[in-house]
Amino acid sequence: MDQSNRYADLSLTEAELIAGGQHILCAYKMKPKAGHRYLEAAAHFAAESSTGTNVEVCTTDEFTKGVDALVYHIDEASEDMRIAYPLDLFDRNMTDGRMMMASFLTLTIGNNQGMGDIEHAKMVDFYVPRRGIELFDGPSKDISDLWRMLGRPVKDGGYIAGTIIKPKLGLRPEPFARAAYEFWLGGDFIKNDEPQGNQVFAPLKKVIPLVYDSMKRAMDETGEAKLFSMNITADDHFEMCARADFALEAFGPDADKLAFLVDGYVGGPGMITTARRQYPNQYLHYHRAGHGAVTSPSSKRGYTAYVLAKMSRLQGASGIHVGTMGYGKMEGDKDDRACAYIIERDSYTGPVYHQEWYGMKPTTPIISGGMNALRLPGFFENLGHGNVINTAGGGAYGHIDSPAAGARSLRQAYDCWKAGADPVEWARDHYEFARAFESFPQDADQLYPGWRHKLRPAA
């Protein structure tokens, strides 16, 4: 059934829709299946995403038609389809009237992903008007809160050197806590790897007090504050809160140095919102494990990593992993810096839409996945700044000397970039950074050819 007379209006302009402030706009790359006309398939997509179905129903009235989603732009050659969703379509909380990400996803990326007349459709950008922005929670804490605890300026406080406890699984409580202590002697921030939780060989009630003891020892010995991001991901929100509450009690007077990590893609938006609302005084660390199933460029359905990052800020994530932009082991390229810019800036023009954030706090880009000191100078140069958290697991625990030396090499890499220095020359006067060349020789050969002749290996 051709529904384009009702669910498409190509006379609408994007500028008018944005000026009106009453619609969320979504841009997709959409291709219909063979034998289906583009506008007809697009209109069916909009119908399925809002008030319609595959036939006319007798219960539809004029009010219903007033909240139809409308296709307002198509370009078949570039597979560009854009839809305007009235704000009133989206579900609101009974308790406080605020918007919810679950409803946004249900409408804009729900049943339309399995429609029989659509070959593929992937959301590449979306726009939220001011009224919508103000109805989402947004972050309660941001990187400035971490800088403050670390004794740094709250503006442009710089690079936070972090790690992931490695190996990913298999450490018992005492070795786990020892690994944390050894890194904290040189670094700032430690996160659980995403599978680490309450395994039978490492129960949280034993691990967390030992980790806190390691933190206190490291703070006493270095005179620096330290930060720990604990994984509270669980199927049950009550279990999440039980883990969080236990950790807060264990950390006691240093509870402000405790962040909560939530696997937001596998756990869903309800898990992020639970953590954001139940623990507004903690830094909310959004891990995105599994996202590549839909965000990968090889997938033509779902949504992009840029869309995921943008959603995370609306939900209230203090920080989210944004990949390594081609400088680490994760899929991506240099242009992925847009994922960082949309979450950290007050406004940004993405692939399709310009987004203003109207005072919503920023979300920190978290860089992780195959990074080490040798890869960081190029990464910072591409991004244009170092106001990020970097969690380098192998980059710290794979350092030839120690995890503490690995942490120092990461800090020295940031200082190298900030000074505009040549990394090989910088290594001559920065021992831990120099030893990173020997720790990761394949990277050194690729990134800094001739380093072996220019840099005498340390004894």
UniProtKB/Swiss-Prot annotation:
Q: What residues does the record give for site: Transition state stabilizer? A: 329
Listed under catalytic activity are: 2 (2R)-3-phosphoglycerate + 2 H(+) = D-ribulose 1,5-bisphosphate + CO2 + H2O; D-ribulose 1,5-bisphosphate + O2 = 2-phosphoglycolate + (2R)-3-phosphoglycerate + 2 H(+)
Q: Which cofactor does it need?
A: Mg(2+)
Pfam families for this protein: RuBisCO_large (PF00016), RuBisCO_large_N (PF02788)
Q: Which residues carry this modification: N6-carboxylysine?
A: 191
PANTHER family (alphabetical): RIBULOSE BISPHOSPHATE CARBOXYLASE, RIBULOSE BISPHOSPHATE CARBOXYLASE LARGE CHAIN
Q: Under what name is this protein listed? A: Ribulose bisphosphate carboxylase
> Which organism encodes this protein?
Dechloromonas aromatica (strain RCB)
Q: What is the lineage of its organism?
A: Bacteria, Pseudomonadati, Pseudomonadota, Betaproteobacteria, Rhodocyclales
